[in-house]
């Protein structure tokens, strides 16, 4: 058995690295911790989680996938966050809906990658 201590990072494909960095920084204040000079990729950080943004020119996201990144948000901030998504004309594909005793909203980044804001945390 291979023993995994934790997830190191999550990687997503983007068609325009600079646009994606701006999206994640402006909307969520994610910190850019590394931007490769010899490749079109960068790592952003939220809490203890790293997300790798990997540019592939001409990338077209496959629609209909359930792949997503779920981001925990405090209950008292949820409605304001949904308002901010709407104010920024960000495409909402699901919700906001009641889910697991809380709420969830799923929306798209500029490349159609699905992101979810939700509460409460999953109990595992």
Residues of each region from the PLM?
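N-terminal beta-strand motif that seeds the catalytic metal site of vicinal oxygen chelate
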Residues: 1-18, 69, 123-124
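A generic structural signal for short beta-strands and their flanking turns/coil linkers
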Residues: 8, 40, 49, 65-69, ...
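Short hydrophobic/aromatic beta-strand micro-patches
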Residues: 13, 70-74, 108
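Core segments of cupin and vicinal oxygen chelate
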Residues: 13-51
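A short beta-turn/loop motif at secondary-structure boundaries
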Residues: 36, 60-61, 97-100
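Short beta-strand micro-motifs in enzyme catalytic cores
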Residues: 40-42, 67, 101-105
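Mid-chain, well-packed structural core segment of small domains
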Residues: 70-83, 90
């Amino acid at each position: 058995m291979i023993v995994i201590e934790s997830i190191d990072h999550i990687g997503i494909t983007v068609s325009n690295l600079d646009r994606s960095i701006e999206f994640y920084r402006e909307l969520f204040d994610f910190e850019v911790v590394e931007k490769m000079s010899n490749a079109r990729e960068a790592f952003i950080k939220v809490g203890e989680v790293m997300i790798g943004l990997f540019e592939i020119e001409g990338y077209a996201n496959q629609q209909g996938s359930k792949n997503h990144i779920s981001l925990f948000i405090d209950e008292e901030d949820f409605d304001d966050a949904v308002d901010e998504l709407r104010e920024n004309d960000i495409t909402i594909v699901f919700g906001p809906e009641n889910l697991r005793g809380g709420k969830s909203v799923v929306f798209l980044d500029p490349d159609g990658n699905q992101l979810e804001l939700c509460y409460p945390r999953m109990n595992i």
